[in-house]
């Protein structure tokens, strides 16, 4: 069975729709949503409803820092654009949608897999995995062979051998990577709704749980339409324009 790993949707309806269609066309039978369903994008209610429906069908979903901020309020450390988007997003969600976000777990374990938004060593702290040091700290914090996480908006792959040797890899889209069973693996699929590597195409990954093959995917979508939704959603015009440009430029 193929598992679609989708993270950092950020209320981007166009990107999420394209990724769902692509994943299903490539054999995905199950979905894991790795947090930050909302924030930045112009369609939070639609995205939350889609994720809630997937969860009802058996998908895994965990809480991201933007999802948490919707429930508890923006953190003081959040940038102005993120804070404004959080406050606007909260006004767009009904009680049931807010309750769904509030009930999301910080992490889930299933079939030797850990699903978490930021890291395994402090899921609620939302510390970034910016390199090998944080990745190894995360891998040492779990007994699971596979850790799937988001938060970082660029695709990356880390591994830890039985002898303690660490490695990291920047994957190429569409290339199957065998996740060897004698290692631990940390998979960051990149952002579906707001990639930040200079390429606006949506990111996600497919993991074949039978063969152990992982592939990172890039999915072009109507980024102009997504940017237009942000511009006209009701956010402050200056903030909305900055967020729209980030989508268009993949940053």
Task: Kindly label every feature range from the protein language model.
Residues 2-10, 112-119, 186-190:
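Active-site-proximal beta-strand elements of phosphoester/diester hydrolases
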Residues 45-47, 129-136, 168-170:
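Charged helix-capping and loop-helix junction motifs
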Residues 26-27, 92-161:
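His/acidic metal-ligating clusters that form di-metal
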Residues 10-15, 39-41, 66-71, 121-123, ...:
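Active-site environment of divalent metal-dependent phosphoester hydrolases
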Residues 32, 60-62, 116, 148, ...:
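Hydrophobic/aromatic beta-strand patches that form the interior of the parallel beta-sheet core
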